[in-house]
Amino acid sequence: ANTDTTGFLQSLQVNDINVKNKNILILGSGGVVQSIIFILKTQGVKKIYLSNRTKSKAEDIRLPYVNNNKSIIEVVEWAKLLKDPPDVDIIINGTSLGLKKDDVIPLNFKKYEKKNIL
């Protein structure tokens, strides 16, 4: 059984985070990201921006969510993300960055001071 979906949904509920009609930025394309996207879609998100250092991995995750050439997922190139991040309500770190003590996510979070960062 996939516990990632249950765990992510519970973390949203426990922290009283409503994602309905929100714009979400997901950093990374690791295994957990697919579960997160599934839950976000079932909860009615407006748009998901997905960025990964390897763009093709993000595109592969986006593909199942394309319908009539439209998708709630927009892939953002990592370099563009660092220069001009999209305006979002919530940021989710799906990368391995942050697991080690000295890890730094190279994103300017000042733009997101009042946003939810997970």
Task: For each feature predicted by the language model, list its residue ranges.
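Short, well-ordered alpha-helices that flank and scaffold nucleotide-derived cofactor binding pockets
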Residues: Q10, V14, F38-T42, L63-N67
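Phosphate-coordination loops involved in phosphoryl transfer and adenosine-cofactor binding
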Residues: K20-K22, V45, K114-K115
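Glycine/small-residue-rich loop that forms an oxyanion/phosphate-binding "nest" at active or ligand-binding sites
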Residues: A1-K22
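Rossmann-like adenosine-cofactor binding region
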Residues: S71-L118
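NAD(P)-binding Rossmann-fold cofactor-contacting core
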Residues: Q43-N68
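Glycine-rich adenosine-cofactor-binding loop
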Residues: L12, N21-K41
